[in-house]
Amino acid sequence: MRIGIFKHLKEMNNWRKTVYKKSPIEIVQALLAQGLTQSEIEANTGIKQPSISRILTGKNKDPRISTMVALEKLYLELATNSFSTSRLNKSKAK
């Protein structure tokens, strides 16, 4: 359930404004625009890099709900500045 990832009403309102209207491609593009690589997105979401690439290229236009929740959670954390890029897990990043 998407609501379960939000601890505060403020975060829910931010989510509605920033994530709800974005497609999977737009969310991945926004994460990349924040300076993340596909490998860093993988390290922080658990979504394999090939899956991220398929979303980005439009080959997978309807990813699993668990994939969307993971992408949306990372996007929201970055969008609300509650998660600085210096704290990102870069262990799998090349």
Curated annotation (Swiss-Prot):
Q: Locate the transmembrane regions by residue number.
A: none
Print the keywords alphabetically.
DNA-binding, Transcription, Transcription regulation
DNA-binding in keyword set: yes
Q: Could you tell me the superkingdom of the organism this chain comes from? A: Viruses
The record places the DNA-binding region at: 38-57
Write down a Pfam family by its short name.
HTH_3
Q: Which residues form a coiled coil?
A: none
InterPro entries hit by this protein: Cro/C1-type_HTH (IPR001387), Lambda_DNA-bd_dom_sf (IPR010982)
Q: Which CDD domains match?
A: HTH_XRE (cd00093)
Q: Which SMART domains match?
A: HTH_XRE
Molecular function terms, GO-annotated: DNA binding
All copies of the HTH cro/C1-type domain together span 27-88
Name of protein: Putative protein P2
Q: Which organism is it from?
A: Acyrthosiphon pisum secondary endosymbiont phage 1 (Bacteriophage APSE-1)
What broad taxonomic lineage does this protein's source fall under? Viruses, Duplodnaviria, Heunggongvirae, Uroviricota, Caudoviricetes
Gene symbol here is 2
